[in-house]
């Protein structure tokens, strides 16, 4: 630290400098600790360098590790597309830079007194003696030129003293131009340039804010839209027009040898062609090399109007040179009256200067004259004044200028020895207006635009920062290398951490495919139009549509989006007609927020023989799951087809002794038969679940748990994701000739990556349903599996069944009993007791007009219940849709059948428990054997994947291959606070998989997830807890609400044990194009790929097979379809 330090720094003004180039400096008054004051001058680039040094030296204070800890002030960003040396830019930056200086010196001493800050504010020699604006002696003679005095009384010593700065003309670039030589400049449309020289070849020497070079004049236009100086018309007496002469007096004198040459010529000058030219359009004239042409009209755009062989037209000026006949006349008039010439080529011809390598024309002129060197050609030599007396430059001065002048080769593009051949021979493009030139069109903008959005909530703690919620659209104005972006969100602007902002392709409904650029926002399911099913002997669902060509749509992120339509999936007849299923339930009478997207229909791609012979596999989201010929496999069903957000899949057990169906039977047909029989047997038998590995997933802390009883002779559907399935009696185990339909093609809707559920402690004691997404979470290496299963079982048995049943009733929000009079054809979204009164467990603010807001503890009257998790309620005089997990039934309305159903099937439950547990355990061990063999996992994204936001609700959708799919509105995550302490839940963190078993803390709408993780030991025994809880008392009706909305935007997993490795070779085909990024693999439609790993979050690790060189990478599972 330095005792001598800066006390205050104030930026008072801006000042323009022209050395070494045009720029502005900021005048800063610096007050030091010894009360002395100094005035220093710093340009913006010095501020920028200081800022980068400070951010590198103090990364913590610069907010690179944690943006909230940043204390180093922000600096205005660089000007990318405007010139930083114009005054309005400098003045606009004046106040921000003043605030930056003031804040910088007030930082803690270890920053404000560091060496970098001290050196920046320390006075330098140029601060003590600011440079004077002496344009005549400036080093950059290619930019600032001296104006020679017109008065004949001026002498050599007064030339520099009375010099005035030349005013350069500014032109606007009308179209983009990419340089083709090092001596040229690239131009951007709309850019303003200073024209230093206008050459008759059509190539102008211009200056931008950063560099100088040659550009075609046809790409430039005067700021007022005119081109007054473009034509060089000579009068009848041979004099240059007054307007042209005024311009030449300012510009062309720079590039002559300083001589005032009298140019007596006729109106039509004779030129000789130096190269052949072929006409490109009707108004041009072609010619051979060495022919003489007459120039009728000249201009500075490089195209002259000539006459050749009686025809008139345009020709490139760079292909012409002055005829030899005119040279002697010019040379005689060197000492004559003053006249201006417009081209350095004429002077070079006049002085008989030819390149030694140029053998086309012999040297001309008098032999007594010494040839002029390259360096001399660019020197401003003073020749004859108007009175004829020579103004000679001393020899010492001439040699000094020759050494230091930068104006050499690129000055005269037609000089072969001092310019690139291309500039001498290549004509510039013609202009459209009078010359017939069509300017090149700028490139088309990209067809897919990128938009930015916030991925989590951020509260700014700095003055010029901006606070925002997750899921908001942001417009990025400036990107800082320090990790902060200047963004606009709504009407507000400010700096935001780049790690909280992600990009995606702008939704465009006209595009066929929907390919989001990041894996954190999975693409939506491609919907298709339903049509009438066709009769199929192999078996297709008669009541549902056949596959059509899919039509892809972009997701609508601001509304609740679900990958299905609101039509209930279960189509069945009342008692008796088990196979037809033609009757469609009525639609709800009000539009639910859940209905936004159609579902896609796909064709079941595997025959029953393939299914029977293929070993079972467990898939998530996309997986086509072959079913084995056993009945105990159905015991993994959660039976929760009505609860929103239900996403469960049964784990099949092979070769069960209770399977009545022969191996040759069509399992798909059997499943369709069970769908039709679901309602018939739901009140005829009390069924208990006997599988010891059951997992119920729910996102709601207030969800209820229910158990299904199963007798020895009963059957259950193989997946609870088949909406409307109930436990069916054994009568459906044999094939019915009336039921020849397999799974509907529409049941294979392409899913969105569904959220991982959060386990509820209350359900762990009574829930007896199986969910593969939860089962995956419990899979661990083989050595740990058996002990974990048995240990958790004994651990779970310590809790009495009464507690589980009681907690289940407390957490339930919509348990309404079904009686035997309930017709099977009643839609699932409408239940008995719809007029029940419920109490709100938390306040809710509506997001859409169709919703309703209510405070905490209010009584509402439920009018209608939709399976999406949204209930139509009346609160006071208002009616609207409300999320069901905000509602809790009153105590007197809880069913008292909860304790009656659990005892009926205990005996049969215990008989098959050990058998099914052993078989399922073997299957899990086999999977974990593969899990242990593959330890290498792809890199986990370093950026937070998008935060999780509260949505308006999730819904149970049509299943595809026995898997329930859910799509939600990616706004934020809302997890209601647990009403009881015995609820086991999870905390959501950034950069963590939702499978982490943590302690839940209530997170409000649009909040950021940074809660602390609690011990994960409580969740280790969850896999067997369900098995030990099967004797607990619980209601018969599986109406738990698992509808807590969870955003599909999620990270890739962290723990390797969460991967499910398939020991079979699974080949899938992509159903749409997908553009990958640094973390995921891109592919085209119709590409075959082998699935190597299936991750619960919906991303599969595949090997692409159709490419020339197969490669591996992560792909979204909802872009894949099982290969036939």
Curated annotation (Swiss-Prot):
Give start-end positions of Basic and acidic residues composition bias.
575-585, 713-739, 912-924
UniProt note: phenotype after gene disruption:
Shows significant decrease in total cellular reactive oxygen species (ROS) and in podosome formation.
PX domain mapped to chain residues: 4-128
* Region (Disordered) location: 414-443, 504-672, 692-830, 886-952, 1020-1050
* UniProt PTM comment: Tyrosine phosphorylated by SRC. Phosphorylation plays a regulatory role in the protein localization. The intramolecular interaction of the PX domain with the third SH3 domain maintains the protein in the cytoplasm and phosphorylation disrupts this interaction, resulting in the redistribution of the protein from cytoplasm to the perimembrane region. Phosphorylated on serine upon DNA damage, probably by ATM or ATR.
Matching CDD domains, A to Z?
Answer: PX_FISH (cd06888), SH3_Tks5_1 (cd12074), SH3_Tks5_2 (cd12077), SH3_Tks5_3 (cd12079), SH3_Tks5_4 (cd12019), SH3_Tks5_5 (cd12020)
UniProt tissue specificity? Widely expressed. Not found in the spleen and testis.
Query: Cytoplasm: is it a keyword of this entry?
Result: yes
Give residue numbers for the modification (Phosphothreonine): 256, 728, 822
Q: Identify the keywords attached in UniProt to this record, alphabetized.
A: Cell junction, Cell projection, Coiled coil, Cytoplasm, Phosphoprotein, Repeat, SH3 domain
Q: Name one GO molecular function term.
A: phosphatidylinositol-3,4-bisphosphate binding
Q: Tell me a GO cellular component.
A: cytosol
Acidic residues composition bias: residue spans: 607-619
Subunit annotation: Interacts with ADAM12, ADAM15 and ADAM19. Interacts with NOXO1. Interacts (via SH3 domains) with NOXA1; the interaction is direct. Interacts (via N-terminus) with CYBA. Interacts with FASLG. Interacts (via PX domain) with RAB40B (GTP-bound); interaction promotes invadopodia-mediated extracellular matrix degradation.
- Protein name per its UniProtKB record: SH3 and PX domain-containing protein 2A
- Species, as recorded: Mus musculus
């Amino acid at each position: 630290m330095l005792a001598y330090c800066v006390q205050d720094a104030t930026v008072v003004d801006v000042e323009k400098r022209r050395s070494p180039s045009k720029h502005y400096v900021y005048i800063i008054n610096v007050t030091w600790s010894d009360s002395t004051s100094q005035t220093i001058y710093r340009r913006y680039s010095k501020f920028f360098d200081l800022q980068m040094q400070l951010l590198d030296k103090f990364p913590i204070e610069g907010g690179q590790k944690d943006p909230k800890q940043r204390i180093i002030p922000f600096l205005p960003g660089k000007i990318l597309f405007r010139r930083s040396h114009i005054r309005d830019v400098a003045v606009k930056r004046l106040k921000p830079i003043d605030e930056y200086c003031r804040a910088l010196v007030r930082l803690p001493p270890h920053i404000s007194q560091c060496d970098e800050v001290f050196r920046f504010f320390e006075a330098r020699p140029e601060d003590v003696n600011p440079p004077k604006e002496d344009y005549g002696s400036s080093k950059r003679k290619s930019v600032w030129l001296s104006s020679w005095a017109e008065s004949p009384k001026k002498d050599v010593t007064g030339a520099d003293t009375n010099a005035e700065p030349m005013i350069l003309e500014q032109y606007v670039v009308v179209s983009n131009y990419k340089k083709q030589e090092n001596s040229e400049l690239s131009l951007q449309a709309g850019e303003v340039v200073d024209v230093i020289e206008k050459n008759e070849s059509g190539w102008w020497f211009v200056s931008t804010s950063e560099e100088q070079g040659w550009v075609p004049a046809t790409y430039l236009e005067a700021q007022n839209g005119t081109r007054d100086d473009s034509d060089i018309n000579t009068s009848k007496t041979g004099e240059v027009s007054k307007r042209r002469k005024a311009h030449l007096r300012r510009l062309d004198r720079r590039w002559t040898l300083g001589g005032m040459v009298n140019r007596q010529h006729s109106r039509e000058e004779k030129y000789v062609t130096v190269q052949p030219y072929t006409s490109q359009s009707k108004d041009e004239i072609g010619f051979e090399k060495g022919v003489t042409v007459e120039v009728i009209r000249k201009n500075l755009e490089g195209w002259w109007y000539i006459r050749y062989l009686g025809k008139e037209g345009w020709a490139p000026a760079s292909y012409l040179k002055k005829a030899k006949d005119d040279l002697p006349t010019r040379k005689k008039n060197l000492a004559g009256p003053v006249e201006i010439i417009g081209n350095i080529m004429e002077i070079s011809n006049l002085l008989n200067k030819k390149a030694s390598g140029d053998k086309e024309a012999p040297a001309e002129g008098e032999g007594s004259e010494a040839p002029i060197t390259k360096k001399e050609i660019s020197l401003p030599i003073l020749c004859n004044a108007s009175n004829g007396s020579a103004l000679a430059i001393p020899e010492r001065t001439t040699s000094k200028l020759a050494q230091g002048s930068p104006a050499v080769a690129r000055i005269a593009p037609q000089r072969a020895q001092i310019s690139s051949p291309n500039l001498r021979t290549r004509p510039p493009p013609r202009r459209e207006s009078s010359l017939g030139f069509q300017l090149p069109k700028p490139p088309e903008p990209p067809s897919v635009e990128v938009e930015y959005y916030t991925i989590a909530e951020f509260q700014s703690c700095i003055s010029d920062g901006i606070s925002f919620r997750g899921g908001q659209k942001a417009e990025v104005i400036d990107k800082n290398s320090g990790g902060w972006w200047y963004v606009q969100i709504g009407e507000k602007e400010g700096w935001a951490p780049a790690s909280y902002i992600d990009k995606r392709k702008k939704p465009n409904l006209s595009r066929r495919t929907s390919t989001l650029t990041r894996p954190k926002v999975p693409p939506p399911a491609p919907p298709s139009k339903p049509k009438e099913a066709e009769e199929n002997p192999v078996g297709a669902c008669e009541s549902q549509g056949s596959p059509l060509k899919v039509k892809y749509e972009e997701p609508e992120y601001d509304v609740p989006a679900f990958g299905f339509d609101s039509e209930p999936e279960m189509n069945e007849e009342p008692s008796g007609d088990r196979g037809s299923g033609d009757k469609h339930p009525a639609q709800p009478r009000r539009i639910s927020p859940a209905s936004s997207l159609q579902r896609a229909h796909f064709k079941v791609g595997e025959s029953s023989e393939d299914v029977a012979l293929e070993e079972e596999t467990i898939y998530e989201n996309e997986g086509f799951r072959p079913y084995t010929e056993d009945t105990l496999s159905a015991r993994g069903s959660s039976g929760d087809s009505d609860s929103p957000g239900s996403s469960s899949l049964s784990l099949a057990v092979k070769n069960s002794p209770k399977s009545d169906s022969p191996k040759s039977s069509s399992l798909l047909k059997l499943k369709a038969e069970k769908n039709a029989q679901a309602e018939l047997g739901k009140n005829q038998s009390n069924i208990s679940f006997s599988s010891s590995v059951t997992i119920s997933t729910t996102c709601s802390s207030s969800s209820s748990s229910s158990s299904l009883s199963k007798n020895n002779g009963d059957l259950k559907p193989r997946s609870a994701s088949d909406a409307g399935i109930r436990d069916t009696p054994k009568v459906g185990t044999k094939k019915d000739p009336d039921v020849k339909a397999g799974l509907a093609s529409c049941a294979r809707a392409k899913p969105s990556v569904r959220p991982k559920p959060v386990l509820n402690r209350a359900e762990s004691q009574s829930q007896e349903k199986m969910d593969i997404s939860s089962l995956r979470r419990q899979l661990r290496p083989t050595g740990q599996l058996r002990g974990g299963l048995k240990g958790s079982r004994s651990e779970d048995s310590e809790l009495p069944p009464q507690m589980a049943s009681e907690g289940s009733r407390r957490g339930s929000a919509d348990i309404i009993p079904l009686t035997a009079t309930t017709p099977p054809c009643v839609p699932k979204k409408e239940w008995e007791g719809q007029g029940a009164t419920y109490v709100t467990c938390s306040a809710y603010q509506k997001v859409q007009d169709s919703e309703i807001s209510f405070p905490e503890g209010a009584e509402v009257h439920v009018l209608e219940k939709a399976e999406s998790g949204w209930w139509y309620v009346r609160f006071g005089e208002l009616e609207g849709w409300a999320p069901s997990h905000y509602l809790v039934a009153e105590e007197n309305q809880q069913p008292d059948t909860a304790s009656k159903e659990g005892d009926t099937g205990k005996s049969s439950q215990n008989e098959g428990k050990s058998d099914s547990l052993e078989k399922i355990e073997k299957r899990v061990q086999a999977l974990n054997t593969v899990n242990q063999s593959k330890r290498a996992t792809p890199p986990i994204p370093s950026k937070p994947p998008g935060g999780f936001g509260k949505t308006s609700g999730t819904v149970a959708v049509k299943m595809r291959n026995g898997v329930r799919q859910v799509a939600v509105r990616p706004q934020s995550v809302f997890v209601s606070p647990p009403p009881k302490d015995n609820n086991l839940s999870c905390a959501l963190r950034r950069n963590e998989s939702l499978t982490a078993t943590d302690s839940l803390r209530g997170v409000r709408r649009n909040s950021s997830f940074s809660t602390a993780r609690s011990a994960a030991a409580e969740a280790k025994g969850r896999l067997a807890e369900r098995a030990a809880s099967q004797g607990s008392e619980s209601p018969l009706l599986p109406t738990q609400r698992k509808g807590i909305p969870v955003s599909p935007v999620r990270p890739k997993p962290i723990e390797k044990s969460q991967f499910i490795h398939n020991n079979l070779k699974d080949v899938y085909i992509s159903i749409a194009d997908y553009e990958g990024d640094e973390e995921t693999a891109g592919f085209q439609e119709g590409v075959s790929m082998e699935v190597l790993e299936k991750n619960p979050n919906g991303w599969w690790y595949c090997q692409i097979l159709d490419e020339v060189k197969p490669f591996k990478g992560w792909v979204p599972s909802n872009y894949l379809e099982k290969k036939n």
